[in-house]
C-alpha cells in the first residue's frame, strides 16, 4: 500500500497561490493520510514540490513532512530548483550524474524514481544520460515487478496547453528505453493536475489532482492553462502481484458520511 501526492506547489508560509494556501492544504492532506492510511508502506510526492523554488518554501515543506507518519520520497518537477532542493533535502539520492533518480526495493517490487526536469523550462527532458541509467536499472531488475514514478507524462493527454509542456520529443527516448520490458506494472506521474488514467504502449498509468490548484478539463485550451479550484486529492495504490488498484481521495470533502450495515443494504 503506497500513497502518491503530487504538485504541492508550496509558497513561503502565509503566501497564497491562485487564491489558496498551499501549506495549509498540504497539512490537511497529511492529517488525512495519518488518520486513515498510517499503515501505508511509503508516500511518493511526484514533483513541483514548491512553486518558485524558494529556499523558505522548501524549509516549510520539510517541516510539514515531519508530521507525516510514514516514510516519504521526493521527485523534482519543473517548478523546483535542483540546487536549493538539494540543500534542504541533502539525503535525497542522486544517480552518478547528479540527477535525482533512485531505485527503491519494496515488498511490491522495484520502484524507479525518475528526474524529468529541464532546468528553467516548463516542459520536461529525459536525456540519453538519464535514459542509460533507467535502462541499466530495468536490466538489473528484469525479473521483478517494476513501477515507474516521474513528474512529466511521456505522452500527450489531450489538453493542448499541457501537451506543449510534457516531455515532448524525449518521450520517444523513454518509450525506446522501456519497450522491451514487460515487467513494468504501472506508471505514476504528476504535472497535469487532473485525474487521468489509461494505458501507454501497454503500460497502465494514473495521475491525479495536486494539493493546491487544478487544471480544468478543457480539451481546447491551447495558449493558456485553465486553472480551477477543483478539490485536491491524494492517491492510495494497492499493489499486488496480479493487480494494481488505485483509489483517489478528495481529502477536503466534508459531505455527509453514513455507515450502512451490510445486513440492511
Question: How would you label these PLM feature ranges?
Answer:
Residues 55-140, 170-183, 201, 223-239:
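Extended active-site neighborhood of metal-dependent phosphoesterases/phosphodiesterases
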Residues 29-42, 123-206, 228, 236, ...:
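His/acidic metal-ligating clusters that form di-metal
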Residues 1-12, 108-118, 147-150, 203-209, ...:
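Active-site-proximal beta-strand elements of phosphoester/diester hydrolases
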Residues 15-21, 90-91, 120, 160-166, ...:
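Short glycine-enriched, charge-decorated loop/helix-capping segments at active-site entrances
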Residues 11-14, 51-56, 78-85, 119-122, ...:
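Active-site environment of divalent metal-dependent phosphoester hydrolases
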Amino acid at each position: 500500500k503506497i500513497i502518491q501526492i503530487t504538485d504541492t506547489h508550496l509558497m513561503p508560509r502565509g503566501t497564497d497561490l491562485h487564491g489558496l494556501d498551499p501549506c495549509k492544504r498540504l497539512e490537511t492532506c497529511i492529517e488525512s493520510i495519518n488518520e486513515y492510511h498510517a499503515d501505508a508502506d511509503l508516500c511518493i510526492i511526484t514533483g513541483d514540490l514548491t512553486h518558485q523554488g524558494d529556499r523558505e518554501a522548501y524549509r516549510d515543506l520539510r517541516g510539514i513532512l515531519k508530521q507525516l507518519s510514514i516514510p516519504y520520497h521526493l521527485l523534482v518537477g519543473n517548478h523546483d530548483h535542483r540546487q536549493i532542493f538539494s540543500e534542504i533535502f541533502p539525503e535525497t539520492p542522486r544517480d552518478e550524474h547528479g540527477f535525482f533518480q533512485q531505485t527503491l526495493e519494496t515488498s511490491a517490487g522495484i520502484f524507479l524514481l525518475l528526474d524529468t526536469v529541464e532546468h528553467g523550462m516548463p516542459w520536461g527532458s529525459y536525456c540519453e544520460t538519464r535514459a542509460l541509467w533507467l535502462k541499466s536499472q530495468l536490466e538489473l531488475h528484469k525479473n521483478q515487478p517494476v513501477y515507474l514514478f516521474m513528474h512529466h507524462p511521456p505522452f500527450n493527454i489531450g489538453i493542448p496547453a499541457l501537451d506543449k509542456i510534457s516531455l515532448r520529443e524525449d518521450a520517444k527516448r523513454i518509450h525506446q528505453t522501456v519497450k522491451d520490458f514487460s515487467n513494468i506494472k504501472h506508471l505514476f506521474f504528476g504535472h497535469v493536475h487532473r485525474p487521468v488514467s489509461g494505458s501507454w504502449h501497454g503500460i497502465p498509468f494514473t495521475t491525479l489532482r495536486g494539493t493546491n490548484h487544478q487544471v480544468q478539463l478543457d480539451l481546447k485550451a491551447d495558449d493558456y492553462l485553465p486553472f480551477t479550484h477543483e478539490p485536491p486529492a491524494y492517491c492510495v495504490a494497492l499493489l499486488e502481484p496480479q493487480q494494481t488498484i488505485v483509489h483517489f481521495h478528495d481529502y477536503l470533502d466534508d459531505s455527509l458520511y453514513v455507515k450502512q450495515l451490510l445486513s440492511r443494504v
